[in-house]
Regions:
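Charge-rich amphipathic alpha-helical interaction elements
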Residues: 1-147
Length: 147
């Protein structure tokens, strides 16, 4: 009988040690999960902002292209004085430069969207990993209490 009691005491001691370890690990894992979720939300916000910026840049590009087209048409229609022609050429060149700059801004906004999407993807993966770690500890903790 003493052997069985010793084994039970040893088993209880091991279970208690395991429970203590789980009690230490659980808050750490929950904190990591919370941090991962917060970071994921931040990246989602950044992605939404980058997408909105890209949309605004694309809309501005359309406006600049329309303005350039208008200036170009005016230039073609105007063939009066040299002064008017020079002014229209300068206006058309300015409009063309604005289109080029807007295209660059659209490309930068698109790149920002890609970067934000990648960061969100990484944050989401980290969140999943932290969630799995917490679930494993919860599972162990529940089964430890049943034992």
């Amino acid at each position: 009988m003493p052997l069985i009691e010793d084994e039970l005491e040893q088993q209880d001691s091991q279970l208690e040690s395991l429970q203590q370890a789980l009690n230490v690990l659980m808050p750490i894992r929950r904190q990591r999960l919370s941090r991962a979720q917060r970071q994921q939300r931040q990246h989602q916000t950044r992605l939404a902002e980058a997408q909105a910026q890209q949309q605004a840049e694309e809309e501005q590009l359309v406006q600049d292209q329309q303005h350039y087209q208008l200036q170009r048409e005016r230039l073609q229609q105007q063939q009066s004085s040299r002064e008017k022609l020079t002014r229209h050429v300068n206006n058309a060149l300015s409009a063309l430069q604005a289109v080029g700059q807007q295209q660059q801004q659209c490309q930068q906004a698109e790149q920002s969207c890609h970067q934000a999407a990648y960061a969100l993807e990484q944050a989401t993966e980290w969140t999943r990993e932290q969630q799995k770690a917490v679930e494993k500890l919860e599972y162990l903790s529940e089964h430890l209490e049943d034992a």
